[in-house]
């Protein structure tokens, strides 16, 4: 994978944020690591941070969380200055499975909290998984919770039948 052109991309630009319903601020643009190999992920993440990205978006199903964590560590950035998102894969849904899988993600990413955790797909035991995310949110382990790739009717169900509504409905957009 080619190196980022750090001289041009974010030169002189400031990071813009959006405030979520719970008051947490998320950078408008994030650096997604889907399909970045384990070999390339540490360098790519470090270079993205050096370039000015302040939101790193990963997922359990990308199989590179540990390498993303290494890239964050290598960058030397203070954790408080970075917004970190991961997504729970459907094989880790269900209350207990989700609690365990978030703990594994925390360890792989080398952090004691996550800024945003999303349910990656609208299949399997989404309600059990969501209740686990609600608990982790209330416990302060996760700063915001949401969904990704959910159909409008499934999103409406998540709002109607849970204590805490999703704070984010992620829809993939690429700038390149």
Task: Report the location of each language-model feature.
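N-terminal binding-site loop/beta-alpha segment at the start of enzyme catalytic domains
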Residues: 2-82
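Generic structural signal for well-ordered alpha-helices
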Residues: 15, 45, 65-72, 99-103, ...
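Beta/alpha (TIM)-barrel catalytic core signal, keyed to glycine-rich beta->alpha loops juxtaposed to Asp/Glu
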Residues: 17, 121-176
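Conserved, mostly hydrophobic/aromatic
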Residues: 31, 48, 56, 68, ...
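Short, acidic/polar
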Residues: 36-49, 93-109, 128, 153-157
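Short helix-capping segments at alpha-helix termini
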Residues: 74-81, 109-111, 137-141, 162-165
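A short, structured active-site edge motif that brings together acidic residues
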Residues: 79-92, 113-122, 149
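CE4/NodB-like, metal-dependent polysaccharide N-deacetylase domain
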Residues: 98-118, 135-139
């Amino acid at each position: 994978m080619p190196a980022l052109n750090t001289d041009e991309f974010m030169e002189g630009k400031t990071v813009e944020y959006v405030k979520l319903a719970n008051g947490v601020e998320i950078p408008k643009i994030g650096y997604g690591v889907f399909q970045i190999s384990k070999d390339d992920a540490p360098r790519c993440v470090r270079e993205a941070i050096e370039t000015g990205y302040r939101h790193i978006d990963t997922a359990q199903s990308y199989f590179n969380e540990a390498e993303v964590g290494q890239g964050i560590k290598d960058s030397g950035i203070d954790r408080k200055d970075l917004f970190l998102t991961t997504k729970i894969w459907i094989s880790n849904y269900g209350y207990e499975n989700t609690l365990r899988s978030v703990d594994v993600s925390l360890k792989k990413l080398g952090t004691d909290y996550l800024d945003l955790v999303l349910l990656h797909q609208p299949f399997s035991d989404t309600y059990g998984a969501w209740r686990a995310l609600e608990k982790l949110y209330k416990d302060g382990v996760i700063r915001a919770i949401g969904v990704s790739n959910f159909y409008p009717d499934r999103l409406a169900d998540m709002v109607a039948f849970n204590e805490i509504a999703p704070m984010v409905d992620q829809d993939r957009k690429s700038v390149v």
